[in-house]
């Protein structure tokens, strides 16, 4: 169950990033995190903090709730 949430969240982050035609490196720079961290989130290898969820939503120009949808 826990992993399912991380997988779905990571997929949403990746979908939004690709919609904006951003590489992981470009996106990481905008969000203020390391590129490998973005990769780990997208692959559901990292349990993300609320602070970093906020950074990611801001960098993607979406609401935090958009990243969670119906998780």
Regions found by a protein language model. Give the residues of each.
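A detector for short, charged/polar N-terminal pre-domain segments
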Residues: 1-8
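Conserved hydrophobic/aromatic packing and binding residues within compact polymer-binding modules
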Residues: 13, 27-28, 38-41, 67
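Alpha-helical residues within the helix-turn-helix
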Residues: 18, 29, 58
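Short, conserved catalytic or interaction motifs in soluble domains
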Residues: 43, 62, 69
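DNA major-groove recognition helix of helix-turn-helix/homeodomain DNA-binding modules
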Residues: 52-66
């Amino acid at each position: 169950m826990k992993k399912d949430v991380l997988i779905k969240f990571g997929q949403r982050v990746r979908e939004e990033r690709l919609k904006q035609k951003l590489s992981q490196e470009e996106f990481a720079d905008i969000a203020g995190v390391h590129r490998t961290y973005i990769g780990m989130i997208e692959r559901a290898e990292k349990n993300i903090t609320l602070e970093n969820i906020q950074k990611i939503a801001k960098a993607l120009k979406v609401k935090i709730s958009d990243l969670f949808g119906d998780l």
